């Protein structure tokens, strides 16, 4: 789950990272009052959960309360990358001498928690890495031992930090990692980290948490806004279905996250575009679970075919087949299915589906391998 900028800043401030003074407004009149309270010179920032707000016109400066009102009037109601702006953050303008970058992420290559920092801030870290790779500094550390002070000092010395900037950067890196571990975050980021005459401030803030850890952090779960979630993902979450909407036209259902991702990869290799990730989870003893998964995938109007890839150990293929039949009986529309059943009672499951297809006219294609299934699904999707 990604938090809004103003929510992330509240958490950062709670942990001792300085942030600009500001408040959230949902109307131009509110924005005007907040700007007056802050002295007139403010920045009005769209609060939506996508990047690129500035380039899309969602971040603008104002030099008076009246101008803040006019700017807010333009930003509120805007649609940026499919997200409608319902609120803005109005905060004091900063006199920035420099802009730095600092963030925490779990690096997928090293599989280690990693601090990334740079003297070049205000742009995407990927852009910095592409144009100025030497400007990016990384600290990999052992999650069992945590981030050691000497590791941070060594990295900052190598990057050329000294004096007061060294002290403040050290402090912010340590606090950013503390926040990440306290909230089980996948990402904590300050970009830009503003260097002002008064010290370092988080001019922008990001905090992405792990959805699977939210039950341990009810205070974060309460911040989730239904309007900012993909409707299909929200419905799946409420039903307990492990689903991610991807926007392609080949629906994917597999029993296991690894199998689902491998299926998606091969669909991509075959020139197709997966519509979703869906992991049914283990067991599938209850046919209703399979039924609900298939019906949910079919709610995406872009889906033209569904590839069902099942490897059955504890799972029994006849229960999977029963769930597919239940779904097809209820489905509001018909799409072709590509089905690969392997494992416990696969012959029984296949016979059930073949009989149903023959009697009801359902278009079900059976395959023997994941490659054959992906190829067939891409072909049917057109």
From Swiss-Prot:
Signal sequence segment: none
Enzyme Commission (EC) number: 6.2.1.5
One MF annotation (Gene Ontology) recorded for this entry: magnesium ion binding
Positions contributing to ATP binding: 45, 52-54, 91, 94, 99
Protein's pathway: Carbohydrate metabolism; tricarboxylic acid cycle; succinate from succinyl-CoA (ligase route): step 1/1
Keywords assigned by UniProt, alphabetized: ATP-binding, Ligase, Magnesium, Metal-binding, Nucleotide-binding, Tricarboxylic acid cycle
Cofactor (UniProt): Mg(2+)
Binding site for Mg(2+): 191, 204
Binding site for substrate: 255
Subunit text: Heterotetramer of two alpha and two beta subunits.
Recorded family membership: Belongs to the succinate/malate CoA ligase beta subunit family.
Protein name from the UniProt record: Succinate--CoA ligase [ADP-forming] subunit beta 1
Source species taxonomy: Archaea, Methanobacteriati, Methanobacteriota, Archaeoglobi, Archaeoglobales
